[in-house]
Amino acid sequence: MPELKIKTEKVEKQLTKEPLVLKTPKEKIDNLGKFYATGKRKNAIARVWLKVGKGKIVVNKKTIAQYFPSETYVKTILKPFVLTKTIDQYDIICTVRGGGISGQKGAILHGISKALDKSAPDFHAILRKGGLLTRDSRVVERKKYGQRKARKKTQFSKR
């Protein structure tokens, strides 16, 4: 019984301490008025700067049409602007590293969505409902020894 009393006294002391005050993080806005966010997908990491402009999109010092050969990639990257009805209202500058084209596309999409969310809090519900603010955490499964691929096995013979 004395051990239980000591433990309850410790818990009571912890409860009577002053509550922790959580600091709200500062919005990532630089001195030029750009909203900054990072996006990730597979092995790709994108750094995105968003500012009010005319709809110009630059990826690694190239236009989006030069960087992504397929038009479907461009359409998916512009999805946050279509949902929020802000096409041609923001200029985007982004740098992307790692992964392939599909992973880089997903990273840019995630970064743009996060930057748009910071620029106007009204967009949060729209972007969340569209599933653009959640990171797609799917990555390639590793190859196991004794198998041909991650899941594919060699042909089994009973005899």
Swiss-Prot record:
Key words, A-Z: Ribonucleoprotein, Ribosomal protein
Source species, domain of life: Bacteria
Cellular component terms per the entry's GO annotation: cytosolic small ribosomal subunit
Organism: Rickettsia africae (strain ESF-5)
Residue intervals passing through the bilayer: none
Name of the protein described by the UniProt record: Small ribosomal subunit protein uS9
GO BP terms in the entry: translation
NCBIfam families: PRK00132.1
Single GO MF descriptor: structural constituent of ribosome
UniProt family annotation: Belongs to the universal ribosomal protein uS9 family.
InterPro entries per UniProt: Ribosomal_Su5_D2-typ_SF, Ribosomal_uS9, Ribosomal_uS9_bac/plastid, Ribosomal_uS9_CS, Ribsml_uS5_D2-typ_fold_subgr
One matching Pfam family: Ribosomal_S9
